[in-house]
């Protein structure tokens, strides 16, 4: 193997910490079946056998990967695990890689979830580089950590998180291995599952309440390489045939600005998201953002504007942070802090021309941006599928026309479809959708994590000078 030295250290650290966690299992629970039955009675539910297995494994083993597609009951299972941990009086922390994923986790569980960066209390070293206050010398105080969207977590962040876990801490990880790998290095979820060293429960059964959804049905059909269903007029999944990128862009603009708001009372800014395979081309994010900005947030004497880099931003614009920034200050009703992270989506509420600053709301937080910091923003009426990971939207519109071969693969289509909660519309050609769903080749990630997990000895680090 040839490694970047930091990548080796991260993967070796992950391997070592996982083995330590496996060596400190919790005491078994003697009356687990009766406790599960109590939860079923109180919540008026009936767990499937795989869900019961996941709950028992989480409690008895103390470490678990829970994976499965939409509609398979991951959230219901998570709530059961959470209830049992709470009944044991454990101090529980919930975390996710992005602000939106953490917010969704909070809404689903009723317990506050934090981003991994917030949980680890990010701070800065003398070179103004991010470090974490919580680490192996100053571990977290939780007795159980539940981590969602593991597929998005790269090796660097996962290594930092594991190093901050105290001995004996239970670790429950949720993710969907059919989604895209993280933007950063590694493929943690895939490698952990492939190692077969950790307990893994995969939920496959789609529950009755989800079976009527074509979004759920087609997501599973895509994963299995099957033909998707698009001919149900009463469904929540539609394909609008358009043969060229120009025609697709025109249709997307109409759907976003007029047809969906009129038919479904959706807010273009808050409820509808265009997800593109690529930035480039007439049906790419750059062109679509210009079109959609002109339609839903046109110039006005009442709206201040600010140029930053080559981008024009206007009050009322939907924007996305495109890199982690640990310096930007934000305030919410409950607290204040620093840090706006890659993939966070917000609305420009106000631009102060005198000070050349913008005030941007990111869900429940408001951040103040200086003009030079706005170079880290892009318009977000349309974003790439990669940037949408960890988010959900009421309605998703996706162009699938003239997709370049490097992006014409199954897990990109699957990731886009699983972002939609209520409505999914593909604008393009059926042939390309079929081609995309049939291509199960995944972006190859070069990693030694699986090998490190399975081997007791790691290769020596040679020739590290200058790496």
Feature annotation, model-predicted:
Residues 1-31:
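Interdomain "pre-motor" coupling segment immediately N-terminal to P-loop NTPase/helicase cores
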Residues 33-49:
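N-terminal pre-Walker A segment at the start of P-loop NTPase domains
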Residues 44-60:
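N-terminal pre-P-loop "Q-motif" helix
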Residues 57, 80, 84-90, 97-108, ...:
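Conserved helicase motor core of SF1/SF2 NTP-dependent helicases
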Residues 64-106, 174, 237-244, 248, ...:
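Conserved RecA-like ASCE P-loop NTPase motor core of nucleic-acid helicases/translocases
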Residues 166, 314-315, 341, 388:
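Residue-level recognition of short, solvent-exposed, well-ordered loop/turn junctions
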Residues 177-339, 349:
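Conserved helicase motor core of P-loop NTPases
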Residues 224, 333, 342-467:
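C-terminal accessory regions
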């Amino acid at each position: 193997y040839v490694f970047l030295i930091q990548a080796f250290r991260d993967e070796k650290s992950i391997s070592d910490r996982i083995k330590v966690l496996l060596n400190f299992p919790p005491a078994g629970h003697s009356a687990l079946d009766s406790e599960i039955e109590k939860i079923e009675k109180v919540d008026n539910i009936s767990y499937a056998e795989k869900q019961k297995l996941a709950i028992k494994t989480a409690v008895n083993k103390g470490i678990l990967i829970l994976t499965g597609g939409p509609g398979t009951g991951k959230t219901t299972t998570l709530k059961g695990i959470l209830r049992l941990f709470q009944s044991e009086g454990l101090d529980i922390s919930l975390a996710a890689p992005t602000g939106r994923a953490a917010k969704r986790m909070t809404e689903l569980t009723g317990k506050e979830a934090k981003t991994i960066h917030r949980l680890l209390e990010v701070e800065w070293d003398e070179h103004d580089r991010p470090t974490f206050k919580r680490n192996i010398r100053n571990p977290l105080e939780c007795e159980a950590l539940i981590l969602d969207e593991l597929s998005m977590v790269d090796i660097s962040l996962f290594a930092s998180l594991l190093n901050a876990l105290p001995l004996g801490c239970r670790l429950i990880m949720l993710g969907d291995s059919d989604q895209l790998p993280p933007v950063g290095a590694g493929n943690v979820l895939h490698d952990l599952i492939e190692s077969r060293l950790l307990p893994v429960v995969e939920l496959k059964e789609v529950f009755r309440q989800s079976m009527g959804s074509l979004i759920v049905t087609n997501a599973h059909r895509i994963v299995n390489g099957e033909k998707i269903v698009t001919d149900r007029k009463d469904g929540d999944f539609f394909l609008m045939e358009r043969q060229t990128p120009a025609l697709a862009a025109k249709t997307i603009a109409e759907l976003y600005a007029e047809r969906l708001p009129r038919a479904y009372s959706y807010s273009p800014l808050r409820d509808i998201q265009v997800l593109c395979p690529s930035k480039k081309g007439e049906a790419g994010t750059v062109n679509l953002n210009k079109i959609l900005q002109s339609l839903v947030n046109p110039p006005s004497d009442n709206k201040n504007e600010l140029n930053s880099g080559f981008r024009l931003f206007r009050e009322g614009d939907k924007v996305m942070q495109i890199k982690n920034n640990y310096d930007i200050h934000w305030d919410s009703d409950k607290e204040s802090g620093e840090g706006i992270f890659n993939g966070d989506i917000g609305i420009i509420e106000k631009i102060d021309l005198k000070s050349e600053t913008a005030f941007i709301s990111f869900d429940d937080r408001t951040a103040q941006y200086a003009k030079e910091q706005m170079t880290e923003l892009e318009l977000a009426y349309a974003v790439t599928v990669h940037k949408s990971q960890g988010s959900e939207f009421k309605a998703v519109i996706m162009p699938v026309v003239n997709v370049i071969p490097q992006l014409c693969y199954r897990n990109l289509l699957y990731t886009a479809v699983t972002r939609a909660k209520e409505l999914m519309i593909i604008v393009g050609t059926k042939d390309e959708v079929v081609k995309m769903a049939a291509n199960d080749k995944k972006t190859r990630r070069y990693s030694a994590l699986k090998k490190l997990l399975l081997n007791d000895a790691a290769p020596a680090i040679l020739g590290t000078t200058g790496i």
